[in-house]
UniProtKB/Swiss-Prot annotation:
Entry similarity comment: Belongs to the Dr-adhesin family.
Protein's name in the database: Afimbrial adhesin AFA-I
General function of this protein: Hemagglutinins of uropathogenic E.coli mediate adherence to the upper urinary tract. These adhesins bind to the Dr blood group antigen and also agglutinate human erythrocytes in the presence of D-mannose (mannose-resistant hemagglutination (MRHA)).
Keyword set includes Repressor: no
Subcellular location: Fimbrium
Origin species: Escherichia coli
Residues annotated as signal peptide: 1-21
Keywords: Fimbrium, Signal
Length: 161
């Protein structure tokens, strides 16, 4: 019993006798981002382009975006999903103006024509990896739109049937 009391007193003394350090911030902050993906990983290139308003005519080529995939197998078709502010049932695919209201209507497809659009998702018509170019063009004449920045958001992934 005496031994138990001594051990208990020693434990308490060690806990209460521990000094605490103070942290003072004096530098820059850093962070680590980790993205976990499916085995079928699709990477979408980003680009910035500049046009004159008079160039917003039907079928005007806007840009090509490179798509690369790895690890895609049977039953997985490389796909792009039009993200927030880039697709709705009324306008279809579009680029949204920085004012949040105006929309530049666009069409998209693979440079080789081997894909299908299903709502806000465009997928390649075969299983497995696909590395290629997506083409974006102006739909209809749209010179009436205000100048400024328009954005199209895309998410790489895969489509399963």
């Amino acid at each position: 019993m005496k031994k138990l009391a001594i051990i208990g007193a020693t434990s308490v003394m060690m806990m209460t006798g521990t000094a605490q350090a103070n942290f003072t911030s004096s530098g820059t902050n850093g962070k680590v981002d980790l993205t976990i993906t499916e085995e079928c990983r699709v990477t979408v290139e980003s680009k910035s382009e500049s046009f004159l308003r008079s160039g917003l005519v039907a079928n005007r080529h806007i840009t090509n975006l490179g798509i690369q995939s790895t690890g895609c197998g049977t039953g997985q078709r490389v796909a792009l999903k039009l993200g927030a502010g880039s697709y709705d049932d009324t306008n279809g695919a579009h680029m949204t103006h920085e004012n949040g209201t105006d929309k530049l209507l666009v069409s998209m497809g693979s440079a080789t024509g081997d894909g299908t659009q299903d709502g806000g998702v465009y997928y390649i018509n075969r299983d497995g990896n696909w590395n290629g170019q997506m083409v974006f063009i102006v739909r209809n004449d749209q010179q009436h739109l205000p100048t400024g920045k328009y954005t199209l958001n895309l998410e790489g992934g895969f489509w399963t049937k």
